């Protein structure tokens, strides 16, 4: 118990430091073209963004438009704020093409065939805690970054598998997204999108998945490395789908384990989200895979989901976003209740191999 409390203190401190170290700007930075250029140069330095001279002028114009969007939105009375993150000199179309699937239309894959068991094990759950945070319970690894690869589906899958494995074994092991990107090809398409459900099925049928340290992420699609994938570390027994368009059912599932979900993450406010409870403009055109790792309620009574993203720790609240929960639309905010699923693990048993050792535990 003492160790878990210590871990949460460290996490809380990192959240505070992350906010303190985020890139900021002020009214005086918007006063002239020269001050805006200086702001752009500071932003490039902060995020280590390299541009050719010709490209810089084009990107500067995009940056200016994004600065004004962030500035004007933050002046509004909204329960969330935006910031100039690493996407600040990308148009929203470019952002969606790379990070929210519009380039390859992989949101269509989220509507594919379902492989779940057809049952919902949490259907008869009565009451649930007022709040749950699987990070506090030690079931969530550090935030990862998918890079410029449409592999969000793999990251969403891995968060859920890492979570249920920790719940069943009391051991947190970072698992390999790259194995899914390189090797899970029956329905999934690597950096061009995929389905979390199909990834769960792949892990089940294969008998498990290897660790992050054994098969590290490269942010690009490669040939499946057969020498690594047989070193299995964690197995699952299948997966189930949460009843569609039912936030109450989703709540029951998240109260018991992290859950993979698909959302519409293509809006400008989502692109530049910084902190607070996101209530912003979005639709139900599912284009991004994430994972819900908890839920809660603000002091003013706003219900929210704690959503783990895969755009690195500088995006949002140290890589997370709080999204409004229990809205009037049955699909949930940004379609969060439309396609949720989670892995099943019936026992603490895992493959007995070279990777079943303490060295991979976090």
UniProtKB/Swiss-Prot annotation:
GO terms for cellular component: aleurone grain; endoplasmic reticulum lumen; vacuole. SUPFAM superfamilies: Cysteine proteinases. It comes from the Eukaryota. The mature protein is not glycosylated. The precursor stored in the endoplasmic reticulum lumen is processed during the transport to proteins bodies to two dominant mature forms that differ by a single amino acid residue at the N-terminus. This is Vignain. SMART domains: Inhibitor_I29, Pept_C1. Keywords: Disulfide bond, Endoplasmic reticulum, Glycoprotein, Hydrolase, Protease, Signal, Thiol protease, Vacuole, Zymogen. One of its GO terms (molecular function) is cysteine-type peptidase activity. Residues 1-20 form the signal peptide. Glycans are attached at residues 326, 346. Residues 21-126, 353-362 form a propeptide. It is found in: Endoplasmic reticulum lumen; Vacuole, Aleurone grain. PROSITE patterns: ER_TARGET, THIOL_PROTEASE_ASN, THIOL_PROTEASE_CYS, THIOL_PROTEASE_HIS. Thought to be involved in the hydrolysis of stored seed proteins. In vitro, catalyzes the hydrolysis of proteins, such as azocasein. Shows a preferential cleavage for Asn-|-Xaa in small molecule substrates such as Boc-Asn-|-OPHNO(2).
């Amino acid at each position: 118990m003492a160790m878990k409390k210590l871990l949460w203190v460290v996490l809380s401190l990192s959240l505070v430091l992350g906010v303190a170290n985020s890139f900021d700007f002020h009214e005086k930075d918007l006063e002239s073209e020269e001050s805006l250029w200086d702001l752009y140069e500071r932003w490039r330095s902060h995020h280590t963004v390299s541009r050719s001279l010709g490209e810089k002028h084009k990107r500067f114009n995009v940056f200016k438009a994004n600065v004004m969007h962030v500035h004007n939105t933050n002046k509004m009375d909204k329960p969330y704020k935006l910031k100039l993150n690493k996407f600040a000199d990308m148009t929203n179309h470019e952002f969606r093409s790379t990070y929210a699937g519009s380039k390859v239309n992989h949101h269509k894959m989220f509507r594919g065939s379902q492989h779940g068991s057809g049952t919902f094990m949490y259907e008869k759950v009565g009451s649930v805690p007022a709040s749950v945070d699987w990070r506090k319970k030690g079931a969530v690894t550090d935030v990862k970054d998918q890079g410029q690869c449409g592999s969000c589906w793999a990251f969403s899958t891995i968060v859920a598998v890492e979570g249920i494995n920790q719940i069943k074994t009391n051991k947190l092991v970072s698992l390999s997204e790259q194995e899914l990107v390189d090797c899970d090809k029956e329905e999934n398409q690597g950096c061009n999108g995929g389905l979390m459900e199909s990834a769960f099925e792949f892990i089940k049928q294969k008998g498990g998945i290897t660790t992050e340290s054994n098969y590290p992420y490269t942010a690009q699609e490669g040939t499946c490395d057969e020498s690594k994938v047989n070193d299995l570390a964690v197995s699952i027994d299948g997966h189930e789908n949460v009843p569609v368009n039912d936030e109450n059912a989703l709540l029951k599932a998240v109260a018991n384990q992290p859950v993979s979900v698909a959302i519409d993450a293509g809006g400008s406010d989502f692109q530049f989200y910084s902190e607070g409870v996101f209530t912003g403009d979005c639709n139900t055109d599912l284009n991004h895979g994430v994972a819900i790792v908890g839920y809660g309620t603000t002091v003013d009574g706003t219900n929210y989901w704690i959503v783990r993203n895969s755009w690195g720790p500088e995006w949002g609240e140290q890589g997370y976003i709080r999204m409004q929960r229990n809205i009037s639309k049955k699909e949930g905010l940004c379609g969060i209740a439309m396609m949720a699923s989670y892995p099943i693990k019936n026992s603490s048993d895992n493959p007995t191999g070279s990777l079943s050792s303490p060295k991979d535990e976090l």
